[in-house]
């Protein structure tokens, strides 16, 4: 977790510097308080997944860019093991493994997400044109799409426009594991 906080602090400082944004401007663009952004930059706070999404959306960068440093790709083959990279931001009931972090040439990022029993997260809309693809690997979960919760079980999938409110929850007694492919529109301003 400490490594993630250090990376997050460096990434946030770097983006602000690159754009010439003050903490006030960053707070306005992300919807995250100036105090919280300052704590994150100093490595004093472990933000929730929801807060990380707000920051990524405000800066118009991928979510995975805040989870781990960009990987230097050696050739066209990239092997990843979810168990080796799984993290649980801010002690939430969701574990995140960025299987394929965002690369501009592909336009997407792929996560393995684990929802612990009882966990629920409703997400604010991402930037216009973002699409999510959810594929359940094991367990039972529900997805909030177009204002309605829909159950999904192992082997089922849904694709939806993520530039609208949406969410995920696990009302069961066992973890629910799914892949989430997030596709970004071609005209992204930064990355």
Residue ranges of model-derived segments:
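Glycine- and acidic-residue-biased ligand/ion/polar-headgroup-sensing regions
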Residues: 129-146
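Short alpha-helical DNA-recognition segment
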Residues: 20-35
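Short beta-strand His + acidic residue motifs that chelate non-heme Fe in jelly-roll/DSBH
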Residues: 123, 143-144, 150-152, 166-172
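Short acidic-glycine-tyrosine-enriched beta hairpin
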Residues: 147-161
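Ligand-binding loop in jelly-roll beta-barrel domains
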Residues: 94-95, 106, 154, 162-188
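A short, Lys/Arg-rich alpha-helix, primarily the initiator
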Residues: 1-18
């Amino acid at each position: 977790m400490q490594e993630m906080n250090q990376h997050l602090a460096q990434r946030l400082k770097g983006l602000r510097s690159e754009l010439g944004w003050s903490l006030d401007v960053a707070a306005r663009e992300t919807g995250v308080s100036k105090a919280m952004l300052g704590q994150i930059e100093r490595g004093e706070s472990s933000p929730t997944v929801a807060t990380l999404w707000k920051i990524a959306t405000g800066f118009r960068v991928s979510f995975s860019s805040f989870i781990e440093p960009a990987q230097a790709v050696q050739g066209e083959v990239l092997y990843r093991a979810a168990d080796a990279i799984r993290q649980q931001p801010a002690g939430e009931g969701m574990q995140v493994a960025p299987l394929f972090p965002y690369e501009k040439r592909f336009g997407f990022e792929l996560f393995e997400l684990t929802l612990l029993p009882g966990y629920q997260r409703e997400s604010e809309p991402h930037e216009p044109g973002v699409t999510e693809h959810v594929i359940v690997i094991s367990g039972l979960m529900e997805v909030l799409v177009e204002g309605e919760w829909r159950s999904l079980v192992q082997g089922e999938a849904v694709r939806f426009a993520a530039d609208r409110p949406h969410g995920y929850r696990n009302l069961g007694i066992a973890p629910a594991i799914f892949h989430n492919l997030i596709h970004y529109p071609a005209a992204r301003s930064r990355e």
